[in-house]
Amino acid sequence: MTTRLSQQADAHIVDRAAALFARHGFAQTSVQAVADAVGLSKAGLLHHYPSKQALWDAVLGHADALGSSACDAVAELPLGRARDLRAVELLADVALSHPGLVALLLAPATRGEDEDPELGPISDAALRAFGVDPSTAEPERLVRVLGALGALAVLALAASQGGHGAAWRAHLIATSFDALGHARPRPDLEV
């Protein structure tokens, strides 16, 4: 039980840190700001993560693990509608559960900056879940997948900020899936 609580605490710390890194950048985010955001003293936070760099590394590691997990979960599915739907479902659940990480991945686009090179492999994992390699993908497919991911990210952040995560999940998935260009299923079937 203690291990699970510790893991939940670490996940909360990492997600809040990611949100602050997204908003202020690594250099402008202080350990004290993260501690305040998670309700710990600075010393308490440093007990979990001995430095700001260790916290940053934990954010990157957690994001990488989530992306790899999503890729692994769809790897055996053939490219196409079923894989795309499963990838959207998995990534929607990740985005709704980890809004700070989503904000961090969106930060370069929202702040008009170049992407942090350390975030590139994490962003690429989302594309790989759809079987897309940006260097070789057909332009329409790449644009549709990027559009689906953009819709998913923005809607997940809005849902999280408004406390609508569970209520919006199905709509978030349907909207993101629609961007991929697959024919809508019959109205009597769930997406």
State each model region's role.
Residues 1-8, 158, 185-191:
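N-terminal intrinsically disordered/low-complexity leader segments
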Residues 58, 69-103:
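Hydrophobic alpha-helical connector segments
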Residues 61-67:
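Short, basic, alpha-helical segments at the C-terminal edge of helix-turn-helix-like DNA-binding modules
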Residues 97, 101, 107, 132-139, ...:
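Amphipathic C-terminal alpha-helical segment
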Residues 12, 16, 20-54, 58:
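Helix-turn-helix
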Residues 111-146, 166-170, 174:
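Amphipathic alpha-helical packing segments from all-alpha helical-bundle domains
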